[in-house]
Swiss-Prot record:
Transit peptide stretch: 1-41
Source species taxonomy: Eukaryota, Metazoa, Chordata, Craniata, Vertebrata
Name of the protein: Cytochrome c oxidase subunit 5A, mitochondrial
Protein family: Belongs to the cytochrome c oxidase subunit 5A family.
The gene coding this protein: COX5A
One Pfam family linked to the record: COX5A
Cellular localisation: Mitochondrion inner membrane
Chief location category: mitochondrion
Phosphothreonine sites (modified residues): 141
Keywords per UniProt: Acetylation, Heme, Iron, Membrane, Metal-binding, Mitochondrion, Mitochondrion inner membrane, Phosphoprotein, Transit peptide, Ubl conjugation
GO BP annotations listed: mitochondrial electron transport, cytochrome c to oxygen
Keyword Disulfide bond: no
Organism expressing this protein natively: Nomascus gabriellae
Keyword Heme among UniProt keywords: yes
Amino acid sequence: MLGAALRRCAVAATTWAGPRGLLHSARTPGPAAAIQSVRCYSHGSQETDEEFDARWVTYFNKPDIDAWELRKGINTLVTYDMVPEPKIIDAALRACRRLNDFASTVRILEAVKDKAGPHKEIYPYVIQELRPTLNELGISTPEELGLDKV
């Protein structure tokens, strides 16, 4: 994993944009490649999956969360290279309901489907786990709304 990060950094440090915007490799990687590779990783402690889930559930369960914080949290969560756990999505959907933001609930479910990508079994599993919450809050899935046909 560290080797891959170092390779990515070394490649990034040895390429530049040409006149047509294409990337060209430099002939010799200078000292910048070595400096750049050191900056591509952190020596900080790693967050466990349980701590990650708890942090996001706590974030979305804040009683005073506003619409901007909700969207910021959703956008940040979507940028991670993973599908959020159903308990995180549950907390986000409940925050949307507290704010009466139905559009965000649909966006969250669409983002989960998109993040699942080619793994067709993930999205139905998440919907199955969230079904009691969806029924309780009166939230329809994008498929129930016909948005998957557009």
